[in-house]
Swiss-Prot record:
Topology feature Cytoplasmic, residues: 49-56, 123-141, 220-239, 295-314
Major localization listed first in the record, in broad terms: membrane
Pfam families (alphabetical): 7tm_4
This protein's name: Olfactory receptor 5I1
Cysteines engaged in disulfide bonds, as pairs: 99-191
Length: 314
């Protein structure tokens, strides 16, 4: 703690409460999340390498998917390693600046993922509804601009929230009832007025998710109309199945983010938030490679080709 000339001390570190359970359950949670971390590392790195080396996957859809895998990897790695350490350690502290950095990167990658998901939905809309214009509308230059704007948008949003959150004073209370440095539980510890922060969170923060979600819903609405016009039942079923799985993943991700960050502060419930946060910080990065790649014939064919070449060379 850092002492001031008033009757309080400023916080120099925070304690991440995490999931308070018996020690034997902490070991079980450690092993479970370690397994999920390994799955995400293998799945996302493998997918990025596959897209990189296979010439048949050099298309806008897989370009966006590669960036989504990268963001998922960074997003997950910002939170889970510290959480794994805390499962095995009695010291669950994180420095003031460490907390600021963790929240900054979390917010950056969370919003960047929302922008990329919106870009992917638009890409699918153009591919299915305007296939003759696809190569023109989704040229390499436009795809690069969309990705750069996604990262810039995520970074700008994160800078706003992080700056306003860490100019606040945190006095005496330093236990964050969460498994990472998230904004709602952090604001509860501040000894200064958080009205502006809560307004930013419920308006500016949620508007990013709402705008991206609207783009996704509109894109898939027009995709659905096009799918219904397909005469072949098998073709209609295949396209609808792929779109439905994508939309399910997006709805879970965007829905949980909107629930956490757009509701009034008086509805805040730390234990509920922790459970919901597990979905968008951990399970969605695990599910994305399964939803976007393992059900995709091109990716499976590319993976089989790489495996066959490895077997033949050995």
């Amino acid at each position: 703690m850092e002492f001031t000339d008033r009757n309080y001390t400023l916080v120099t570190e925070f304690i991440l409460l995490g999931f308070p359970t018996r020690p034997e359950l902490q070991i079980v949670l450690f092993l479970m999340f370690l397994t999920l971390y390994a799955i995400i590392l293998i799945g996302n790195i493998g997918l990025m390498l596959l897209i990189r080396i296979d010439p048949h996957l050099q298309t806008p859809m897989y370009f966006f998917l590669s960036n989504l895998s990268f963001v998922d990897l960074c997003y997950f790695s910002d939170i889970v390693p510290k959480m794994l350490v805390n499962f095995l350690s009695e010291n669950k502290s994180i420095s003031y600046y460490g907390c600021a950095l963790q929240f900054y990167f979390f917010c950056t990658f969370a919003d960047t993922e929302s922008f990329i998901l919106a870009a992917m939905a638009y890409d699918r809309y153009v591919a299915i509804c305007n296939p003759l214009l696809y190569t023109v509308v989704m040229s390499r230059g436009i795809c690069m601009r969309l990705i750069v704007l996604s990262y810039l948008g995520g970074n700008m949003s994160s800078l706003v929230h992080t700056s306003f959150a860490f100019i606040l004073k945190y006095c005496d209370k330093n236990v964050i009832n969460h498994f990472f440095c998230d904004l709602p539980p952090l604001l509860k510890l501040s000894c200064t007025d958080t009205t502006i922060n809560e307004w930013l969170l419920s308006t500016y923060g949620s508007s990013v998710e709402i705008i991206c979600f609207i783009i996704i819903i509109i894109s898939y609405f027009f995709i659905l109309l096009s799918v219904l016009k397909i005469r072949s039942f098998s073709g209609r079923k295949k396209t609808f199945s792929t779109c439905a799985s994508h939309l399910t993943s997006v709805t879970i991700y965007q829905g949980t983010l909107l629930f956490i960050y757009s509701r009034p502060s008086y509805l805040y419930s730390p234990n509920t938030d922790k459970i919901i946060s597990v979905f968008y910080t951990i399970f969605i990065p695990v599910l994305n490679p399964l939803i976007y790649s393992l059900r995709n014939k091109d990716v499976k064919d590319a993976a089989e080709k790489v495996l066959r070449s490895k077997v033949d060379s050995s």
